[in-house]
């Protein structure tokens, strides 16, 4: 029988529900259980693919091409699993599917309502996440805060799950805040009490409380919270701020959270062996070297827009005992006149993905600086496209080289709309998305980065591609096309072998990086940046 764990949040948002859920998933996996995890987002968008990075942060892409919440990146990195379309469910997706069924006549003339039709669809998504992966445990995080009107159908579905699958197969975890009032010198439990009261008013009695605190909670305070919220004192789990996220699974384990969960779910498993994880935590806390990377992008005001890139850079740094210090540069503010002063002193330059014409010329200036000064460069998606345009302009002499994304009628579109995108009308969910194979050129820098593999599988998210009309012309000037689709039609990787490291990929390598298994291109880039 599949077991279900539901993680909700109260008092305020951004308490770290996603990290708690991911940490618990890691603990249960290390107990020998097969775990899957999903995020419910209460917004009306079908997915975050068309949302501004300033509002939502990064759009994380799964193997099957689903555009998802950035929390799925945390899940994949912490638990080291690959997720799917059932791992991110939005209100928009639920309503869209229910309305399609209604139009087909699937409800046989019934009045379609939130209960039971919407809640049944939500429960179907929960159960499907388990059956499609054959998981022992499904962990479901509900976005937002208890009390939000948008979350009510999801919470009602969670309430119904208890009677549907049996109380012995369900655990409810509620994350709350115990604030410290500096003026009074006291910690206050009242917000937690009220949050749990509101959750109980919706029919859900939490089994475990994870309380976010600034200072340690005393045993007497733990007892007080337990008494007012009707949980066992040992089920009140303290979650203090930490210097590295990798401490959180170990902190939860030290408070027996995974043991409490397994006992409630009648799961007889050995204790989680977290030796390797503890070693990772210790390494991260004691890095001796430093590598300075300049990240040049369009959305740098919100670093969460590049969170997987940031994490992938850090993962590669752990391998060489180096802290990767990332400084952000707004590409709109970089010019031919100031780029050298701005980027001087950095060990490497990276230009990640993005959309639209804003800030492209600044990216091109950063790429030119890296190429001409032999500073290690890694381009991702848009960063690969701009690298091709910079090379075409400044090396091949095609002065008006550009992208069809800026000017669809330009004479020299080095980057152009993919043929199968020309008749696409809807913007959402229609890009080239998900895992695709890439054939690597033997002896290339890219091939070496991946252990001389012939073919790799990487995740994509793009609508434009390199225009093959210019492949021979740029190759004659020294640009190596070191990665292509197996049929050789789509350019996936370009490089300049004369430079210390100048590699750019159309795909998004950051989505497959793990803290204990860095992604190949990122590792090669950081090695070159560190002079290894």
Swiss-Prot record:
Annotated residues that bind L-glutamine are located at 54, 354, 382-385, 405, 463
Gene source species: Ligilactobacillus salivarius (strain UCC118)
User: Does the record carry Glycoprotein as a key word?
Assistant: no
The protein's GO terms of the molecular function aspect are: ATP binding; CTP synthase activity; glutaminase activity; identical protein binding; metal ion binding
Residues given in the record as CTP binding sites: 13, 148-150, 188-193, 224
- Tell me which residues this entry annotates as catalytic: 381, 508, 510
Q: Which reaction does it catalyse?
A: UTP + L-glutamine + ATP + H2O = CTP + L-glutamate + ADP + phosphate + 2 H(+); L-glutamine + H2O = L-glutamate + NH4(+); UTP + NH4(+) + ATP = CTP + ADP + phosphate + 2 H(+)
A Pfam family reported for this protein in Swiss-Prot or TrEMBL: GATase
- Assembly and oligomerization: Homotetramer.
| Protein name listed in UniProt | CTP synthase
Give UniProt keywords alphabetically.
Answer: ATP-binding, Glutamine amidotransferase, Ligase, Magnesium, Metal-binding, Nucleotide-binding, Pyrimidine biosynthesis
Output the superkingdom of the source species.
Answer: Bacteria
